[in-house]
């Protein structure tokens, strides 16, 4: 580790892997977004087809004027584009939320991987309920009530599994879990279908198919 930035290589079952991510609940600013993108691009250029494991522990995007002025939106979009490029070039990209995943720092990493997994004790949410209340103008009491029955409004790793955003939890033998993920994670986006099957997002897959059919 280099501060809050993780970068390295490993050999797993005789296969080299690229490891990249963050630690310490790192806020993702321009520096960290570009550093992760660099590792992904270097892997694509120098090691065709090598799997990439994204280790995710972030409090979300860096809320700082310095990063806003430097174009944090473009830096984070660049990171997401690099991960997408790696997938299109045949790299298996696996995300693992091992601690905390919030907001844009999660959207531009784990949610762009071939599949994202999590440890059972991980914390995942895109927006806190007080922030949802400010944005939607709905009272917190209503949002809290909705979160009891609707995974879309509720934080927690179990709700993201139900919605399909997290493909599954890694419990027990983590080596076996990684082995299975590298071998069986889908190349196509299965999140909407997983959400429908699990009851967390009942209409997303149907709406996607209607849009595709209309095109």
Question: For the regions a protein language model found, what residue spans apply to each?
Answer:
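Structural signal for hydrophobic packing residues in well-ordered secondary-structure cores
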Residues: 40, 44-47, 83, 87, ...
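Short, hydrophobic/amphipathic alpha-helical packing segments
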Residues: 33-41, 76, 110
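STAS-typified acidic loop motif
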Residues: 9-34
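Conserved catalytic cores of soluble enzyme domains
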Residues: 60, 64-175
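N-terminal organellar transit peptides
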Residues: 4-7, 137-143, 150-161, 168-215
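A structural preference for short, pocket-lining loop segments at secondary-structure junctions
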Residues: 15-20, 36-63
């Amino acid at each position: 580790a280099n501060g809050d930035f993780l970068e390295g290589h490993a050999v797993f079952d005789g296969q080299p892997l690229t490891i990249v991510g963050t630690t310490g609940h790192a806020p993702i600013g321009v520096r960290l977004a570009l550093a992760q993108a660099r590792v992904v691009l270097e892997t694509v250029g120098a090691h065709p087809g090598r799997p990439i494991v994204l280790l995710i522990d972030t409090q979300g995007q860096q809320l700082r004027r310095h990063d806003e002025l430097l174009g944090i939106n473009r830096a984070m979009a660049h990171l997401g584009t690099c991960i997408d490029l790696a997938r299109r070039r045949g790299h298996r990209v696996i995300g693992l939320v091992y601690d905390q995943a919030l907001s844009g720092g999660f959207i531009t990493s784990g949610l762009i991987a071939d599949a994202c997994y999590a440890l059972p004790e991980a914390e995942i949410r895109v927006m806190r309920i007080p922030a949802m209340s400010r944005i939607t103008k709905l009272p917190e009491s209503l949002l809290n009530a909705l979160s009891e029955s609707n995974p879309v409004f509720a934080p927690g790793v179990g709700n993201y599994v139900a919605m399909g955003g997290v493909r599954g939890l890694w419990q027990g033998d983590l080596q076996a879990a990684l082995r299975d993920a590298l071998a069986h994670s889908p190349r196509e986006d299965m999140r909407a279908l997983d959400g429908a099957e699990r009851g967390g997002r009942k209409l997303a897959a149907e709406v996607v198919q209607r849009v595709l059919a209309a095109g």
